[in-house]
């Protein structure tokens, strides 16, 4: 899996919440308590949803200026 390089040394909690045919994936950066959520079809698979949640967390942390 291609984890964004800026997140490699950060502690991130990932949770999955299935809701019918959709799964909500939440990623939270432990140090800053920044949390993001995405949703996708159950058929996408856990790894795909995890990667997309990590990419979104990376984007949000960069936008806030927390990471570069």
Features from the language model and the residues they span:
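Negatively charged, low-complexity tracts enriched in Asp/Glu with abundant Ser/Thr
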Residues: 1-9
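Short acidic DE-rich linear segments
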Residues: 3, 65-68
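Amphipathic, hydrophobic secondary-structure cores in small proteins
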Residues: 10-64
């Amino acid at each position: 899996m291609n984890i964004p390089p800026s997140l490699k040394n950060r502690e991130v909690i990932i949770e999955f919440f299935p809701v019918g045919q959709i799964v909500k994936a939440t990623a939270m950066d432990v140090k800053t308590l920044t949390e993001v959520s995405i949703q996708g079809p159950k058929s996408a698979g856990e790894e795909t949803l995890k990667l997309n949640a990590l990419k979104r967390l990376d984007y949000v942390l960069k936008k806030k200026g927390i990471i570069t």
